[in-house]
Amino acid sequence: MLGLLGNTTLVCWITGTALAFLMLLWLMALCLFHRSQEHDVERNRVRQARPRLFHGRRLRLPRLVHHHHHHHVTGVTSVGVHHHHHHSPHRLHHHKHHHRHHHAHGARR
C-alpha cells in the first residue's frame, strides 16, 4: 500500500510540474500576443490620425471628371474637361481660385 501511495505522489508531482510549466508557457505566449496587438493598435491610431485625403493615394486611379463638375447642365459631355489638371493637395486652395476665375470668364478657349 505504501508503494502505491509513493507512486501516486510521484505521478502527482510530475503532473503538477508539467501543468505548471505548460501554464507558464501559455501565460508567456498570451503576454507576447497581447504586446504585438498593442503595437498594431498604435499603428492603427497613426493611420487614423492621418487625414483621409492622403489615405491610399498611391493606389487610386486618376478620375476623369472632378466631383465639382456635377453641377453643370445635364446632357453636357466631358469633352471640355481636359483643361482641368489634377493638383496635389497643397495646391488645392489655388485650384479653387483658378476654378472660379476660369468659370467666371465663361471657360473660353
Swiss-Prot record:
Keyword Transmembrane helix: yes
Biased composition (Basic residues): 81-109
Membrane topology: Single-pass membrane protein
Single GO cellular component term: membrane
Annotated segments matching region Disordered: 77-109
UniProt entry keywords in alphabetical sequence: Membrane, Transmembrane, Transmembrane helix
Principal subcellular localisation of the protein: membrane
Protein name (record): Histidine-rich carboxyl terminus protein 1
Originating organism: Mus musculus (Mouse)
Transmembrane segments: 13-33
Annotated localization: Membrane
Recorded superkingdom: Eukaryota
Name of the gene this protein is made from: Hrct1
